[in-house]
């Protein structure tokens, strides 16, 4: 008989994450990657930073030393670091438009942010390669890797074992050579917010970013040689502000169309994550 897909409620129910149990699962190698995902304006970065801070605090107090587990060779826990899964935060100089507030990370180390100049080409295949290297390095130092972002395809590429040579996913029965360098036991946490609250946050955040100089940031990228067509291809803020700077939209039209586009984008992100659940991925949703 074909495998029955799980029944997914229209809205996920929030949970309370048992941090101690999650830590024990990591030490026992039942978890080898924590994933914090969610739509834009859902508070996922803040949650990931808070989680990493809790892990760091416990490690500093030595609470993980001698932690009882089932494994004879438990995974060490010296702290936590964050790997970004955002397709646009990889670019230098694209800060306000991508919500790249590096001060939010505090003293938590982060990776795969500001690794390329704006206008450069980057894709899911390169992300998977970069993730392999960073994930292995973090774990080799006894740190807990936390993947945080809203780019669903990037998240799937490293947690479902996408094989870009054959264009198929290796999530089912992948062998050691196929999955080499990728996590086998990810633990998914989703940041949950209602559509109404999310859209209100998006609108407030957009107005704040416009006041903070988002238009000037994108004008500077164009002046520095970033091709307009490339910025437009990045979508959302970079698309509509570039069109405004080219004289194709009024300021009012730019703001209105951009807000609508971000609302729709957040909805598509949530649809992607619910689709992951329908395919069998267990996401633990939390209210932030």
Enumerate the language-model features and the residues they cover.
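Catalytic core of IPPT-family isopentenyl/dimethylallyl transferases
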Residues: 1-76, 184-288
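N-terminal phosphate/diphosphate-binding loop that engages ATP/GTP or pyrophosphate donors
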Residues: 10-34, 45-146, 154-168
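Gly/Ser/Thr-rich helix-start
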Residues: 39, 98-100, 150-153, 162, ...
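Conserved, function-defining core regions and hallmark residues within catalytic/recognition domains
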Residues: 86, 150, 269
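Short, conserved catalytic or adaptor-binding loops enriched in Gly and charged residues
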Residues: 102-107, 178-182, 276-278
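Noncatalytic linker/hinge segments flanking ATPase motor cores
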Residues: 121-131, 152-157, 228-235, 261, ...
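Short, surface-exposed helix-loop/turn micro-motifs enriched in polar/charged residues
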Residues: 123, 143-147, 230-233, 254
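Phosphate/Mg2+-binding loops and adjacent switch elements
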Residues: 137-203, 207-211
């Amino acid at each position: 008989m074909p495998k029955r897909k799980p029944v997914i409620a229209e809205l996920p129910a929030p949970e309370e994450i048992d941090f101690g149990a999650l830590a024990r699962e990591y030490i026992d190698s039942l978890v080898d990657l924590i994933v914090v995902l969610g739509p834009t304006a859902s508070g996922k970065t803040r949650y990931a930073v808070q989680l990493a801070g809790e892990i760091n605090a416990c490690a500093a107090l030595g609470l993980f030393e001698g932690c009882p587990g089932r494994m004879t060779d438990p995974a060490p826990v010296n702290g936590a670091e964050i790997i970004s899964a955002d397709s646009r935060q990889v670019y230098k100089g694209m800060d306000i438009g991508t919500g790249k507030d590096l001060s939010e990370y505090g003293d938590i180390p982060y990776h795969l942010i500001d690794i390329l100049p704006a206008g450069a080409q980057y894709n899911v295949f390169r992300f998977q390669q970069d993730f392999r290297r960073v994930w292995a390095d973090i774990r080799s130092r006894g740190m807990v890797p936390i993947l945080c972002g809203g780019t669903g395809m990037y998240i799937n590429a490293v947690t479902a074992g996408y094989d870009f040579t054959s264009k198929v996913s290796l999530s089912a029965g992948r062998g050691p050579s196929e999955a080499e360098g990728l996590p086998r036991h990810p633990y998914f946490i989703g940041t949950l917010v209602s559509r109404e609250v999310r859209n209100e946050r998006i609108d407030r955040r957009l107005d704040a970013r416009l006041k903070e100089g988002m238009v000037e940031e994108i004008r500077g990228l164009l002046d520095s040689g970033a091709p307009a067509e490339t910025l437009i291809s990045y979508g959302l803020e970079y698309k509509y502000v570039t069109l405004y700077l080219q004289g194709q939209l009024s300021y009012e039209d730019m703001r209105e169309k951009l807000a609508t586009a971000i609302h729709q984008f957040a909805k598509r992100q949530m649809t992607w994550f619910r689709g992951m659940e329908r395919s069998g991925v267990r996401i633990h949703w939390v209210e932030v």
